[in-house]
């Protein structure tokens, strides 16, 4: 079991090669291909690589390594550590905001930015952002958070 506690030093090397890529094929192509099957794989016990438990939540998530390591240096490190332990089928993590994780995880699988955007509100936006930052998610996820901030929070403050 791999347990990671949020701290100041949770940043991981982004140049870690998570999977063996075919030379000349960008990682974004692999992610696009995975996301085409994302709805089928999201939280699917039958096809999952591991059970993911988030401290503070009672519901487990059934996750697939490839979806997560392509998008998060945090998960790259988690799966690297888990592969070196005797039991890599259960992963336990601690996040800044457990209650906003499920929609974020679904977004990582499907890439459905509108659905994820719609789960944000004034009360949870900052918590969503904390998870995005903690997991080291890339420009795409950050842009969705930024769009929410601009469209919903700044707009309402100006009126």
Description of each model-found segment:
Residues 1-63, 112-113:
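N-terminal BTB/POZ boundary and linker segment
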Residues 4-5, 14, 22, 69, ...:
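Weak global preference for isoleucine
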Residues 123-159:
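Alpha-helical oligomerization segments
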Residues 48-137:
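Canonical BTB/POZ domain core
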Residues 10-11, 15, 106-108, 124, ...:
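Intrinsically disordered, low-complexity N-terminal regions enriched in serine/proline/glycine
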